A protein has these predicted regions:
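Conserved short "hinge" loops at termini or chain/domain junctions
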Residues: 1-73, 87-95, 99-100, 106-108, ...
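Low-complexity, serine/threonine/proline-enriched polar segments
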Residues: 125-127
Length: 166
């Protein structure tokens, strides 16, 4: 079965620090991973599957289109960045794992990458809070949101994903 991605390469490049010259193959898997981990957990299986099917069939309209463009795409853009950034400077080739460097630039430190990841997480959580507020007040527009059964993923309504600090 085909996988529907809720954002395009253009969405990611236009709304993040990812350069337009970056090869799609370097980050596309992080979009898919973030979509499956984060979006499905907030949508639940039934609504996630409905939106995926509509995207594949090119029939996404009305309230569902609004939900995707206003809430899900911004969430996914920033969740994908939290997944991609820690790996952005590495590549795995037949000779091993390599860290990229440039003659006229400086590689970001781990602390700098962690800072960027945290900022992207804050953006993602902001859009997620907006989504949760919207879907709670408008769940009647999306019957799939409340129709999960048995082994389906049930929608998560808790946005706080921050790490514990003791």
């Amino acid at each position: 079965m085909a996988t529907a991605l809720f954002i395009s390469r253009t969405d990611l490049v236009k709304n993040t620090i990812v350069s337009g010259a970056t090869d799609t193959d370097l980050f596309i898997q992080y979009v898919k991973i973030s979509q499956e981990i984060h979006l499905e957990s907030y949508l639940g299986s039934k609504l996630y599957d409905k939106i995926s099917a509509d995207i594949i069939a090119d029939t996404l309209t009305g309230d569902y289109l609004y939900l995707v463009t206003e809430f899900l795409q911004p969430m996914l853009i920033h969740y994908a960045m939290t997944s991609y950034l820690p790996f952005a400077s590495y590549s795995v080739k037949s000779g091993g794992i390599f860290k990229h460097s440039s003659e006229n630039s400086e590689t970001a430190s781990k602390d700098e990458v962690d800072f960027l990841v945290q900022k992207e997480r804050e953006f993602a959580e902001h859009y997620t809070r907006r989504f949760v507020d919207y879907i709670c007040f408008n769940s009647s527009k999306f019957p799939e949101y409340t129709s999960n059964k048995e082994s389906d993923v049930y929608p998560d309504k808790d946005v706080n994903s921050s790490n514990w600090v003791l």
